[in-house]
């Protein structure tokens, strides 16, 4: 199908909560152009690289549509009181922020923290934009109206947006407009009746192949001359001219769910976005040729903190899963009560607890900034994000250390258990007094899929970079830390009264 089929939407009233089946129908064979292994994928819900990832997202929609989860995963739309995803809630009280975190945790638990860009991530960014439309109005009131209308459309139709907000790594030594070809980085190339035309590429749309909409913008600092790249626009994933060039689809290479229990189910995929003269109607343009607003959207609205509150709740959940894996592996190897291993487990638990506590501190230290909207604590958020690129590899390394060869001394695949010539050997030498060989192998394969497979290693890169390079996050902490209070202490120490004897 080559026509644009926008996801089924309602205007003016809230659609019934979307089920998983409705979500899958909406993205199936809708004309989106996804490329993997040299092939154009017509239907991501059927292709082996994407099918199970799409079903994992569908399960999240089913959870939210289940009346048993109404309070945890939804809230009443301000439009008409009907339930909508809590990720779209604009928090006004501490209880609201807590409720948003609990919703994010519920979905993160369902994916073991292994899918970062689920529909609740970019939802947080749009909630942040709608909380502070005045930032967009600086370019003209119509842009503020557009972003609020689009937010309401996402919210009231339970839609899934992904984003690509980083220019491709072509030549980082030059600004956007001085690249060898001015249409390498995604930007506007001309206006056309009723809208604008966008051309170029942007990285890296995690979950893009599964989403309804792409938000295309730029978080990298732009310079004078870069105005054409200073845009913020929403594009349906099946818009003509939009192509998603997926990285290797790990799930397609995962032979079965026993050997690759995580790869086979939770590969959210990452895609380079290519725009071949994509037309965007004015109503889906929120920022137009304005470098200041392009910058301010991240830092002068609560978008970045709402989106990353979800990201951190997801990460804390993933670390809890890692702790569980390590504990079960120690039980399997007989090291669980070995004091040096207990010390290492204590270090792991400390690091996981720091992350978890920092997520909760974002709520506790949240403040109403203006417009009656609550912002999670930026300093707390950015501090834990800044240390993530050190904490994460440290934790993975400890788990590698305590496991020895446990994740490697494994049958080559599930099929080895079916060969009578070796099945008895596997049962005898891989089992433990408490655990049948097959159960122990399943556990170790689960851990290896988390840590050592291509899927596991991509996750380590993801945790390093999903919130931007760590030097940038540290700059955020620098900008937000209360240095006045710190230097005040130094000044007080320097002006202490003389000692009695002096
Ligand atoms: C798995 C994964 C998923 C992602 N998902 C998304 C997504 O969904 N949407 C999206 O928009 N983006 C996504 N990203 C992209 C991510 O936002 C970028 O990778 C990130 O912003 C870093 O940019 P870069 O990769 O271009 O690195 P660069 O900006 O090129 O930097 C690379 C390295 O160079 C060094 N460096 C560069 N400049 C400096 C400097 N001034 N000072 C000190 N050191 C410097 C640092 O070591 C830095 O880490 C994802 C990335 C990964 C790896």
Give the residues covered by each predicted segment.
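Acidic/polar, glycine-rich intrinsically disordered N-terminal extensions of enzymes
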Residues: 1-75
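Generic structural signal for well-ordered, non-transmembrane alpha-helical segments
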Residues: 51, 55, 152-155, 317-320, ...
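Charged/polar positions within long, soluble alpha-helices
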Residues: 166, 331, 357-364, 393-400, ...
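Alpha-helix capping/hinge segments and adjacent helical runs
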Residues: 379-502
């Amino acid at each position: 199908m080559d026509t644009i089929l926008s996801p089924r939407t309602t205007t003016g009233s809230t659609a019934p909560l979307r089920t998983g089946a409705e979500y899958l129908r909406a993205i199936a064979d809708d004309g989106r152009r996804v490329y993997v292994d040299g092939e154009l994928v017509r239907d991501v819900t059927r292709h082996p690289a994407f099918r199970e990832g799409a079903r994992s997202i569908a399960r999240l929609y089913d959870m939210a549509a289940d009346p048993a989860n109404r309070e945890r995963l939804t809230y009443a739309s301000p439009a008409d009181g009907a339930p909508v995803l809590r990720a779209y809630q604009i928090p006004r009280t501490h209880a609201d922020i807590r409720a948003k975190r609990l919703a994010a945790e519920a979905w993160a638990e369902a994916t073991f923290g292994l899918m970062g860009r689920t529909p609740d991530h970019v939802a947080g960014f749009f909630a942040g934009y709608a909380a502070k439309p005045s930032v967009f109005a600086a370019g003209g009131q119509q842009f503020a109206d557009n972003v609020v209308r689009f937010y309401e459309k996402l919210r009231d139709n339970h839609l899934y947006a992904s984003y690509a907000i980083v220019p491709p790594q072509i030549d980082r030594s030059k600004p956007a407009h001085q690249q060898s070809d001015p249409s390498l980085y995604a930007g506007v190339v001309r206006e056309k009746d009723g809208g604008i035309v966008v051309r170029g590429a942007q990285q890296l749309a995690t979950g893009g192949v599964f989403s309804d909409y792409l938000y295309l913008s730029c978080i990298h600092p732009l310079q004078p001359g870069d105005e054409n790249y200073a845009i913020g626009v929403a594009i349906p994933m099946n818009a003509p001219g939009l192509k998603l060039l997926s990285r290797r689809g790990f799930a397609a290479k995962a032979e079965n769910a026993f050997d690759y229990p995580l790869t086979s189910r939770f590969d959210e995929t990452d895609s380079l976005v290519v725009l071949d003269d994509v037309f965007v109607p004015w109503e889906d343009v929120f920022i137009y040729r304005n470098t200041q607003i392009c910058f301010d959207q991240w830092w002068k609205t609560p978008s970045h903190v709402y989106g990353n509150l979800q990201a951190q709740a997801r990460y804390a959940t993933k670390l809890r899963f890692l702790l569980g894996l390590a504990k079960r592996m120690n039980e399997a190897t007989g090291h669980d009560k070995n004091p040096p291993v207990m010390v290492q487990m204590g270090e792991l638990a400390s690091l996981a607890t720091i992350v978890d506590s920092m997520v909760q501190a974002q709520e506790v230290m949240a403040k109403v900034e203006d417009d009656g909207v609550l912002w999670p604590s930026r300093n707390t958020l950015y501090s834990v994000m800044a240390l993530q690129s050190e904490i994460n590899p440290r934790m993975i390394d400890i788990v590698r250390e305590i496991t020895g060869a446990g994740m490697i001394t494994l049958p080559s695949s599930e099929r080895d258990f079916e060969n009578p010539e070796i099945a008895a050997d596997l049962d005898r030498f891989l089992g433990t007094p408490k655990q049948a060989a097959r159960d122990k192998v399943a556990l170790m394969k689960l851990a290896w899929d988390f840590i050592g497979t291509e899927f596991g290693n991509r996750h380590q890169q993801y945790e390093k970079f999903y919130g931007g390079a760590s030097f940038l996050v540290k700059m955020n902490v620098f900008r937000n830390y209360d240095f006045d209070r710190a230097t005040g202490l130094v000044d007080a120490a320097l002006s202490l009264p003389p000692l009695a004897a002096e």
